[in-house]
């Protein structure tokens, strides 16, 4: 079990809230970004962004780049470089942020992430079969 801030986890919601159904999750210790699609499947990608790269990797909106609506840093680089990801996820309404506290519990079929932010706790179940669920 991983507990606390020693394993930073970032989150970005995509689409229109408050009932978001697509996310990007960044696991700092793994340098992986998990993309949670609206069809309840997920894929992971290596986070290759670093401080020497632009904060905004692309700007398909033809407006001055800002976040929101554009994802930035590692989320933005992935959003810009993976084919069809922009169409599948859309843009963001809120700036990416780190979970204030995280608990990650691995189990035989996958893992459960608890993300504590402000007065909200969200639980994400990432299954080894490539499916995910937001537990309420």
Model-derived regions: residue spans:
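Extended, compositionally biased repeat/scaffold regions that form elongated interaction surfaces
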Residues: 1-136
